[in-house]
Amino acid sequence: MEDKWRWSLVAAVPPVLWGSTYFVNAHFMPADHPLWGSALRAAPAALLLLAVTRRLPHGAWIWRSALLGILNIGGFFLLLFIAAQLLPSSVASSVMALAPVALTLSAWALLGQKPSVVLLIGAAVGAMGVPLLVGVGTVGFEPWGLAASLTAMLMNSIGSILARRWQGEIPVLHTTCWQLLWGGAALVIAAVVVEGAPPALGPSQLGAVAYLSILATAVAYLCWFGALRHIDAGVVGVVGLLNPVAGVSLGILAGGEALAGTQWLGLAIVLGCMAAVQVMPTRHPALNGEPAEREPGD
């Protein structure tokens, strides 16, 4: 149980950092260059981790990291960009709140992690609390935006589980670096094609890029994939509901925003579901993946 709580705390780091990106992007990054904003998150993070690992993908990990880089980084960020153009942020957050359910079901199908009733209920009820928290109203939205948001959520859920399935004995630092390399390259190409040259950045914007790339991307993804190796994917997914919690909290603390009564109710539901899945019994199912793979020279 102590190990589960420790890794649950690690799993809480990514959604908190990702939740802060809404505020940082809105206040510091150029609003008319969203693709370059995404590329400037992924590419420097990849190069930073590559400088540490000094290893490029090899063997089966060439195509694996390319696929995972598109699912978890490149394609994921691109679809989020499309969704952000077509959907209110509250609707997009509510769609992404379905990720715990998608992660749980993907882990069941690909890893053999049969979810408990408590986990399924916690994931579903927690997802229902997010629309209350972010204040979804009756505003209309584009079907294509909804499709982009749903596809992004499913891609990231499946990509996260595949990363766990294929982990072998390759260090998480290496596999995370390789995914960011492929995803970052795809984003840079997309940014050049769609938006042209990168925007000029001032000191505050360079500071924002450093925060987004080092903390909200490199550190966040290392913690995300590390936690997935040690605790059930469904638990990681439910902890991921801290994403909108962090975003709303930062808006209150730094933006002077106030919560309505229904938003407090949504916050209580999300936090209650997170607490419920932490106290359920821990299972250690065998992985239905490929044989363990070692680094050359190990």
Name what the model sees in each region.
Residues 43, 49, 106, 115-135, ...:
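Hydrophobic transmembrane alpha-helices of multi-pass small-molecule transport proteins
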